């Protein structure tokens, strides 16, 4: 049954009446015929989960786009629903690079999504750069002093302390 399309960070998945649906339906039927009833499952994820799945994957160096985030969000949801064993291996199909949809990441960091997306950023996913030294501080400090001051500020930002040996 065709569905109404709404704004989505996973635009490629938001197709109201995909031409490939009859083929997918046939493949699912064949999969269940071979594996038995209930071996094929579908989970639904929300926009918030999709964008945060992408950010989580990217934070760990996987360079995923929003569709990759959707895959990861679906995996998390499937595990929560008990559709997978805790240690079961999963392979995710993340087909595009994060740069393709970098605007969605920027909207998340800036909290500028239009209301239709129903996405509210969470602080723990906002990985925005922070200045260590202002431009004025940088130009007023000569080489070695700049390096020492930048190092000191980074230590403070990270909450590090001197370790006694």
Question: Where are the regions a protein language model picked out?
Answer:
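Claisen-condensing/thiolase-fold acyl-transfer catalytic domains that form or cleave C-C bonds
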Residues: 47-104
């Amino acid at each position: 049954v065709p569905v109404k399309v709404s704004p989505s960070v996973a635009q490629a998945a938001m197709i109201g009446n995909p031409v490939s649906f009859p083929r997918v339906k046939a493949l699912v039927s064949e999969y269940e015929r071979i594996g038995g009833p209930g071996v094929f499952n579908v989970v639904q994820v929300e926009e918030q989960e999709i964008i945060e799945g992408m950010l989580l994957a990217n934070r760990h160096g996987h360079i995923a786009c929003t569709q990759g985030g959707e895959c990861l969000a679906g995996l998390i949801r499937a595990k929560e629903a008990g559709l997978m064993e805790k240690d079961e291996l999963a392979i995710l199909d993340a087909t595009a690079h994060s740069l393709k949809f970098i605007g969605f990441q920027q909207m998340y960091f800036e909290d500028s999504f239009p209301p239709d997306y129903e996405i509210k950023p969470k602080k723990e996913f906002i990985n925005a750069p922070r200045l260590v030294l202002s431009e004025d501080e940088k130009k007023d400090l000569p080489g070695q002093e700049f390096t020492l001051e930048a190092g000191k500020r980074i230590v403070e930002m990270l909450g590090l302390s001197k370790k006694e040996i």
